[in-house]
Amino acid sequence: MINVTLPDGSKREYAEGASPLDVAESISKSLAKKALAAKVDGQMWDLVRPLEGDASVAIITDRDPEGLELIRHDAAHVLAQAVQELYPDTQVTIGPVIDDGFYYDFARKEPFSTDDFDKIEARMREIVDADYPIVREVLGKDEAIATFKSLGEEYKAQIIDDIIPPGEQITVYRQGKWFDLCRGPHLPSTGKLPKAFKLMKLAGAYWRGDHRNEMLQRMYGTAWANEKDLKDHLTRLEEAEKRDHRKLGAQLDLFHFQPEAQGSVFWHPKGFMIWRELEAYIRRQQDADGYVEVKTPQLLNSVFWEKSGHWSKFRENMFVVPDEIPSTESDAPILSGEGELMALKPMNCPAHVQIFKNAQRSYRDLPIRMAEFGCCHRNEAHGALHGLMRVRQMTQDDAHIFCREDQIADETLRFLKLFETVYGDFGLSEISYKLATRPEMRAGTDETWDRAEKALADALTAAGMTFSIAEGEGAFYGPKLEFHLTDAIGRTWQCGTFQLDYVLPERLDAEYTGSDGAKHRPVMLHRAVFGTFERFMGILIENYAGSFPLWMSPVQVVVAAITDAAGDYAEEAAAALRKAGLRVEVDKRNETINYKVREHSVQKVPVIAVVGAREAEDRKLALRRLGSNGQQIISLDEALVALADEARAPDLKRARS
């Protein structure tokens, strides 16, 4: 007999050879009907695969995250089968699950087109209707290679040959006559796959991500547990398209990119005005929280990066400045004569350690909270660049806290409060937290890791925050906290960082004198609230759909004159508003007021102050708010007080209350 422990702690006995499906059927027929797979001793398991001994078993349905991942995994297989049935000259390569969907890379001489999608989706539905049993088969490495080669599947054979150790068995999954290399698990049959799937787009992808290899065709799709979830997802995508920060950046004249500076942003006056507001805001928070601000070099010698460990672990992501500029047809090589190899900094932390080391430090000096709006460069692959979200030149609201080990919990709690305050001020109050724990490859002792993980967990608990554990996902030098934010249309973004580091102070020989008179290593806490200004601005643009709160808006008020006669009063009102601290433009063009209002609304100006002859005579303003059809007529003096107060940043409003 096999003893099975269920999630509620209860135990049941089953005959040898029982499967998770037998377990589900013994609980209820409805659960068996909903069952897609199982977790056996924490590992995903095919629903009909026999259990191999006593085990804990949890049934997976489409209500579980693992169930949705399984649906998407099977959708990728059904896609590959449909493509090969329709286009037999196609080779399959890889087809993983990704956020909200899946993709499959195909090798085919003729290019696919999005016009092919309807035909492919129709065949996918036919495969679902056929309800082919999905059968797990085990093959030896040599047999598997021979099998795939006999089918002309050179890519699959190469994967097996390169990745699978000699003598190790592999699994394939068969559905009808079609099969694929896969570790599984899968649904019991293709009929279990909901038809709530849709092909989305095509892209090119190099085999194994190497530009020296052949270009494949990547077909993206999305799959959900039911039609409603699919429809909701497609609606979110439509809304996200409207909010795309790259489109809004051009529409609102905030920034642009160009080929001569890939991954680096050209900030326009309006975009940089928002940047300045963000920088001033976060600087005030850090000043109030006891941070000191520093500025460190961008270009440092390779010897420096060798000491920090970045030269060996991060060099491929660094921009290296050679000592020699190669010759051209008309010029000889240019030599600096210094014989140095330099690199632009990819991060600020090693430079901050140098400032810490530049003075004798005592335990009484700690903690030292050192902040920098540091410009960093990372040599991201061209294909990975994505607007403001993924750039090569970035500015971080970076800070490092040098503290004693007994101060870790307090400093963590202090940062969590700062983080929640800041994100609440931007309307991003739905935050989930993860504690990423020790990875297999790590520095430090288990005792040190125990203390560090406990300190972070205790701080989260003390702050009243619910958190999940991301086992093994910490950095090699220490555990970290991950912050996941939900925006206005339900998308999740990972922002900000908080990482505990025992390694860098050791590598760079940072020390302080303890209360015992001996030298000790400080603990280094890496933290950022925004992360990078570029990415945070991209998130804000999309979260607000370009309609920024008044305090952030690059143009806060437009005074629009109805007639030429009101032009002088429009200028007078604008001057008074500017004196009150507002960013104001005047529109006296010979256009209708409706045209002006419409144009400034497209530019997302939050307040349009309309003035005509009557307003000029009465010294009033007719205020129209973005998104509202009505207007509020108030005196200029009242408008000055009300708008100046409304335009204050949230922290400045709190300071006045």
UniProtKB/Swiss-Prot annotation:
Cellular location(s): Cytoplasm
A Pfam family matched in the record: tRNA_SAD
Alphabetical list of InterPro entries matching this protein: aa-tRNA-synt_IIb, aa-tRNA-synth_II, aa-tRNA-synth_II/BPL/LPL, Anticodon-bd, Anticodon-bd_dom_sf, Beta-grasp_dom_sf, TGS, TGS-like
SMART domains listed in its UniProt record: tRNA_SAD
CDD domains per record: TGS_ThrRS, ThrRS_anticodon, ThrRS_core
Coiled coil: none
EC number of the protein: 6.1.1.3
Binding site for Zn(2+): 349, 400, 526
GO terms of biological process kind: threonyl-tRNA aminoacylation
Region (Catalytic): 244-549
Alphabetized UniProt keyword annotations: Aminoacyl-tRNA synthetase, ATP-binding, Cytoplasm, Ligase, Metal-binding, Nucleotide-binding, Protein biosynthesis, RNA-binding, tRNA-binding, Zinc
Catalytic activity: tRNA(Thr) + L-threonine + ATP = L-threonyl-tRNA(Thr) + AMP + diphosphate + H(+)
Gene Ontology, cellular component aspect: cytoplasm
Family of this protein: Belongs to the class-II aminoacyl-tRNA synthetase family.
Protein name: Threonine--tRNA ligase
Gene for this chain: thrS
